[in-house]
Regions:
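N-terminal Rossmann-like NAD(P)+-binding domain of SDR-like oxidoreductases, especially those catalyzing
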Residues: 1-184
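Short, contiguous strand/loop micro-motifs
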Residues: 2-4, 94-95, 148, 192-193, ...
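Generic alpha-helical secondary structure signal
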Residues: 39-42, 63, 94, 199, ...
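Short-chain dehydrogenase/reductase
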Residues: 97, 147-155, 191-199, 203, ...
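A general boundary/transition motif marking the beginning of the first structured unit of a protein
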Residues: 112, 192-197, 298, 317
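Short, basic/glycine-rich phosphate-binding loops at helix/coil junctions
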Residues: 183-185, 222-223
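Catalytic core of nucleotidyl cyclases, primarily class III adenylyl/guanylyl cyclases
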Residues: 187-189
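C-terminal substrate-binding subdomain of Rossmann-fold SDR/epimerase-dehydratase oxidoreductases
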Residues: 201-342
Length: 342
C-alpha cells in the first residue's frame, strides 16, 4: 500500500513514517520544513534503511500538490501538516486559519477529484473539547467554541473532512484527537525539535535539565487539582504512532462507504505538572531547577482521555510507560546537545 504523509518530517509525522516503513508500507512525505528539518529525512533512512520519496511543498500551493497526486496513486493519506502553537495562533490567527484550514481544504479537494478509494487519517487534537465538564473526556463530550485559533482550525478541519466524506463514497476517514505526546525514538535519531521557547512541557523540562534554560517555570500552582498544577494525559510517541497505523489498517478492512469517525488517543491517566517533573527526576537521576510562575493564559485545568472507544473499535491500547517516554526524551535532548556542540 502507498501512503502519503503530510508533515512527515515533524515530531509525530517522522515517527509515524518510521512505523509505516517498518510495517512494509511505501510512503511519500511532503513537508514545507517550517517546523521541521530536512536532516530528519536522513535520520528516517538511518533507522529504517529506506529513504522515502520526499517533496518540499506547502499544501496551500494547490498546483504543486496536484502534481504529487498525478504521479502517484495513494491508498491512504495521513495528514499531520499544520502549525501547532496555541500562543502564536492567538497573535496571528489569519496565519493559522490559512495554513491549517486552507491546506486541509486543498488536500481534501484533490483527494476527492481523483475518484480513487482513499483512506484518510487526520491529526486532530483534544483542544477541540476545551475544558470538559466531565473527566475523563469521552467522544460524546461537546466540541466547544475554541479559545485559540489553533483549536478553531482543528475543529474546522474535522468539519471539512466529515462533510466531504458524507457525500463522497470514495473517502473513508478517521480523526485522531491526541492528548499530549511525549518521548522520542529509542535510537535518539528523531524526536521533538522545539524552536524557540518550548510550549510543550517535556522539551521545556529537558532543555532546563541540560542547561539550555536557566530554570523551568511552572505556570501556576493554584489550580483546583491534587497539587495545584495542571493535569494532562501524556502519551508515549511510540503508542501514538501505532494508533495511526492501527486506524489505517482498520479503514483498509472497512467495507462501508462514507465512513467517518473520531477517536481519543491517550492513556486515560491524568498526571500533574509536578508529578511529571518528579517522574523525570527519578527516571533520569536529575534534580531540576524550577520555580512557580503565574498562570498562562488559555491553559485549561485538566484534560485526560477516556479511551474505551478506540480500545473497543480499533483494538489499540497505550502500552508504554511515562518513565520510558521521559527517558527517551532525555536521551534525545542529550543527542541534540552533542550535535550542537559539534
Amino acid at each position: 500500500m502507498k501512503i502519503l504523509v503530510t508533515g512527515g518530517l515533524g515530531f509525530i509525522g517522522s515517527h509515524t513514517s518510521v512505523e509505516l516503513i517498518n510495517k512494509g508500507y511505501e510512503i511519500t512525505i511532503i513537508d514545507n520544513l517550517v517546523n521541521s528539518n530536512i536532516s530528519v529525512l536522513k535520520n528516517i533512512e538511518k533507522i529504517t534503511g529506506f529513504r522515502p520519496e520526499f517533496h518540499k511543498i506547502d499544501l496551500r500551493n494547490k498546483n504543486e500538490l496536484k502534481k504529487i497526486f498525478r504521479s502517484n496513486i495513494f491508498n491512504g493519506v495521513i495528514h499531520f501538516a499544520a502549525l501547532k502553537s496555541v500562543s502564536e495562533s492567538v497573535k496571528n490567527p489569519e496565519l493559522y486559519l490559512s495554513n491549517n484550514v486552507e491546506a486541509t481544504k486543498n488536500l481534501i479537494d484533490i483527494i476527492s477529484s481523483k475518484g480513487k478509494k482513499t483512506n484518510l487519517i487526520f491529526s486532530s487534537s483534544c483542544t477541540v473539547y476545551g475544558q470538559a465538564e466531565k473527566l475523563p473526556i469521552n467522544e460524546s463530550s461537546p466540541v466547544v467554541n475554541q479559545e485559540s485559533p489553533y483549536g478553531e482550525s482543528k475543529k474546522i478541519c474535522e468539519e471539512i473532512i466529515r462533510n466531504e466524506i458524507i457525500t463522497n463514497k470514495n473517502i473513508n476517514g478517521i480523526s485522531l484527537r491526541y492528548f499530549n505526546p511525549i518521548g522520542a525514538h529509542e535510537s535518539s535519531l528523531i524526536g521533538e525539535l522545539a524552536k524557540g521557547i518550548p510550549e510543550n512541557l517535556v522539551p521545556y523540562i529537558t532543555q532546563s535539565a541540560i542547561g539550555k534554560r536557566k530554570e523551568l517555570i511552572i505556570f501556576g500552582n493554584d489550580y483546583p487539582t491534587r497539587d495545584g498544577t495542571c493535569i494532562r494525559d501524556y502519551i508515549h510517541i511510540k503508542d501514538l504512532v501505532k494508533a495511526h497505523v492501527s486506524a489505517l489498517e482498520f479503514l483498509s478492512k472497512m467495507k462501508k462507504e462514507n465512513f467517518y469517525d473520531f477517536f481519543n488517543v491517550g492513556t486515560g491517566k491524568g498526571i500533574t505538572v509536578l508529578e511529571l517533573i518528579k517522574i523525570f527526576e527519578d527516571t533520569n537521576n536529575i534534580k531540576l531547577n524550577y520555580k512557580i510562575g503565574n498562570r498562562r493564559a488559555g491553559d485549561i485545568i485538566a484534560a485526560y482521555a477516556d479511551t474505551k472507544k478506540i480500545n473497543n473499535t480499533i483494538g489499540w491500547y497505550a502500552k508504554n510507560t511515562i518513565s520510558d517516554a521521559l527517558k527517551t526524551a532525555w536521551n534525545w535532548e542529550k543527542q541534540l546537545s552533542k550535535l550542537n556542540d559539534n
